[in-house]
Curated annotation (Swiss-Prot):
Residues bound to Zn(2+): 299, 303
Catalytic activity, EC: 3.4.24.39
InterPro entries: Fungal_M35_metalloproteases, Lys_MEP, MetalloPept_cat_dom_sf, Peptidase_M35
Protein name: Neutral protease 2 homolog MGG_10927
Molecular function as annotated in GO: metal ion binding; metalloendopeptidase activity
Amino acid sequence: MKYSVGITALLATLAQGAAVMSKRDIPLDVKIQVVNNSEVKASITNSGSSSIKVVKTGSILDSADVEKSVIMAGENKVAFDGIRYQVATAGLPAEAFQIIEAGETIEVSFNVASTHDFAQGGDFDIAALGTFSVAESDSGDIFSAMAFESNHIKAHIDGTEAAKVRRSYLAKRTMVQSDCTGTRLTQTTNAINSCRSLAQRAASAAQSNSAKMNEYFKSTSSSAVNTVVTTFNRIASECNPSGGASRQYCTDQIGACSPGVIAYTVPSQSIMVNCPTFFTMPTTSNACRAQTQDNTILHEVTHLSQVKGTQDYNCYGYTCMRQLTSAQNLNHADTYTLFAQAIKVGC
């Protein structure tokens, strides 16, 4: 994607909606530095007077290869080629959380060469940008979200060394035959078929229900409507158990089913994986904002480059979705998911 601005302007645009996401003053400060060519070290400091319980899953604290940074080569954003999640918003296990005590600093490291192509090498601008989902100390349910933006740094990356890291990462992606059998096959097939119905209803509603378009996508412009309709039509085409561009798996393929993850997608490989939590969920639901098997499939399908190539922004659930900008909503997997569920239920 071509940008006419550098990283500072890009991050300002992305953060415009994210900045209002914090309903409380949650004092987490993120700083990054680059070491060993393409390794990023991040420190997250709680400068407040009380502990904060944040969701690790899908965030900069996650050990999996989720999107943790924005990288620019001049005016071009370097494409992210890692994992996109669907994360549960309620009933998360203790392992999904990180408690950051008052005054404590948590340090994490990740290698951006694993999920970005730096083969040509050169100078890059890097910053960490995202959200932390927050829960009460005695709860496994997400109740708010906090946006963060780190310092911006310039780094010179050796393409040859970065390519070695990337080759090692790609070698871990071992493709196997589909393992969806028995009840898991039945559940997955039913969910895919139901996903198609969800998408078809949503595509129709996007053209006629301006109130819902405003509520979820914050726009009723012809451009926004066209984007939403096109995306849902592509979802409907992809939600086909015997066709489509993606491969569906019922067991973890790359070790990414961490606590709280319902399913994940590797867009560059057109792989979608349903994690164990997926198979404990209902196929569908008449609850307004329920997480179900069918809308999980819909969520993951939007991540496919053939459909929309959406992002998560580590923003899950209605409360967080409402605080994004229109531009973010139009490229946000859970916005499409929540819209489709609302249209189905009529809420």
